[in-house]
């Protein structure tokens, strides 16, 4: 998540952009890219011979899904802190002490926790769109470059950036 191809790679690419674009921060892009980086590690075989590592990766996916439910529960459904902690305990197998500070963060930063999985899902959706539209012209590396070279952008701009990649590669 924090390393390559996650935030480190995203940061390296952002250093190539004009200053104003390198300082913009859109949580769904940044955290979504980092989760997508975790997925890339899995797809590229990082866990093929490390079963416990893959289990940790899968557990982290479940944790991120719980985050979305808990953040929404707290801010849209009127959940208490105790309900949020209990959701993690019951649904993810977390220990209360492990998630209490997480829940406190969600209480003080509405919507931040949902950005991880929302951004990841949008990047995955855009990749599927590129693969489907481009067929054999789709290039895995070029797609990923198009995403990160576009900079840390809102999700609607990401879609436009991928659209330009598709148009340039489909010709």
PLM features: residue spans?
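N-terminal maturation segment of proteins
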Residues: 2-171
């Amino acid at each position: 998540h924090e390393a390559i191809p996650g935030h480190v790679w995203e940061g390296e690419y952002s250093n190539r952009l004009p200053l104003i674009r390198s300082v913009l921060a859109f949580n769904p892009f940044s955290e979504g890219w980092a989760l997508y980086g975790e997925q890339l590690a899995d797809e590229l075989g990082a866990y093929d011979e490390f079963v416990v590592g893959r289990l940790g990766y899968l557990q982290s996916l479940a944790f991120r899904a719980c985050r979305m439910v808990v953040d929404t529960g707290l801010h849209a459904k009127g959940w208490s802190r105790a309900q949020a902690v209990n959701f993690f305990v019951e649904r993810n197998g977390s220990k209360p002490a492990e998630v209490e500070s997480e829940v406190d963060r969600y209480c003080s930063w509405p919507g931040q926790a949902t950005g991880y999985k929302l951004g990841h899902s949008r990047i995955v959706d855009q990749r599927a769109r590129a693969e489907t539209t481009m067929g054999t012209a789709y290039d895995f590396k070029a797609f990923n470059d198009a995403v990160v070279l576009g900079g840390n952008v809102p999700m609607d701009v990401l879609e436009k950036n991928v659209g330009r990649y598709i148009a340039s590669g489909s010709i």
